């Protein structure tokens, strides 16, 4: 069965897609990262105010509500929220959304195929950097893809209690990851730069993937700090002890990583371990900490 199933794009849609291929992704992303770290005083505050107004950012829920309290754009973008701004569902069987944003797609993995958008599919193997053992664990499992827009809170949290087993940095493209491009660029999430985090949980393995994008200057985790930059040209794998004093245990709702400018989070679950909440569907806005699945194993 073919992995491609695309609608015929219009002329202007083809132009938009072509621009993504021609766009100098890495230089622009590096420039954006540099600019976001500059301390320009009133200029920085003015830019933050314009950005917050343009994207309707809710600063009332942030610890710092005044744009003048941020010294850099990145500090604003990584703003922590007030305590209890995102209550975590405490039901032991609840699996919670890892980030604010919007659901791009969710559902069952068909053998090794995941839905990208409207008939676009990609495989576990390509997404997981050809780690066949990891891919095998999630065949016929469940997945959810969450898109973080520029307005959203950009720290990423744990959907359940887990212990870190492996992290893989995968170099790649930096295509934008909005819904339009997800419908028109084949294998988008499997082509973009990403950080794959594999965890052990009470119901088996779980993967949480932080996918990079245009102007996503860096991806970080709480245990390793900033993963990129610098950007390796090779896949880099890190393995962790899951027992003993050096093991990294994280609780449901704990922060695990962050983006500096928006992108996408993908979660994978093994077959017959979780049941997705029936009312969730593509396009639904999400709040970190809300239940999106129930543990059934």
Curated annotation (Swiss-Prot):
Locations listed in the record: Cell membrane
Disulfide pairings: none
Lineage: superkingdom: Bacteria
One record GO biological process: phosphatidylethanolamine biosynthetic process
Enzyme Commission number(s) from the entry: 4.1.1.65
Stretches that traverse the bilayer: none
Pyruvic acid (Ser), modified sites: 263
Its job: Catalyzes the formation of phosphatidylethanolamine (PtdEtn) from phosphatidylserine (PtdSer).
NCBIfam families from the UniProt entry: PS_decarb (TIGR00163)
Descriptive protein name: Phosphatidylserine decarboxylase proenzyme
């Amino acid at each position: 069965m073919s992995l491609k199933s695309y609608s015929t794009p219009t002329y202007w849609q083809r132009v938009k897609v072509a621009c993504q291929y021609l766009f100098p992704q890495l230089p622009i992303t590096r420039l954006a990262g540099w600019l976001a770290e500059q301390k320009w005083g009133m200029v920085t505050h003015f830019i933050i105010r314009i950005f917050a107004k343009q994207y309707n950012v809710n600063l009332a829920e942030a610890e710092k509500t005044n744009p003048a309290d941020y010294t850099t754009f990145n500090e604003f973008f990584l703003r922590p929220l007030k305590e209890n701004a995102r209550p975590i569902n405490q039901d032991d069987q609840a699996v919670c959304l890892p980030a604010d944003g919007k659901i791009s797609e969710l559902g069952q993995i068909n053998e090794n195929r995941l839905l990208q958008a409207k008939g676009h599919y990609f495989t576990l193997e390509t997404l997981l950097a050809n780690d066949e053992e990891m891919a095998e664990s999630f065949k016929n499992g469940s997945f959810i893809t969450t898109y973080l827009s520029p307005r959203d809170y950009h720290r990423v949290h744990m959907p359940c209690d887990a212990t870190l087993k492996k992290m893989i940095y995968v170099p790649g493209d930096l295509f934008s990851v909005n819904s339009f491009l997800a419908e028109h660029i084949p294998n988008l999430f499997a082509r973009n730069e990403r950080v794959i985090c594999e965890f052990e949980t009470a119901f088996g393995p779980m993967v949480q993937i932080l996918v990079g994008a245009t102007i996503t200057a860096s991806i970080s985790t709480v245990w390793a700090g900033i993963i990129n930059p610098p950007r390796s040209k090779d896949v880099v794998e890190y393995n962790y002890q899951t027992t003993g004093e050096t093991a990294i245990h994280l609780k449901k709702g704990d922060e695990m990583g962050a983006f500096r400018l928006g992108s996408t989070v993908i979660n994978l679950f093994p077959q017959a371990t979780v049941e997705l909440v029936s009312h969730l569907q593509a396009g639904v806005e999400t709040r970190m900490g809300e239940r999106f699945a129930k543990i059934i194993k």
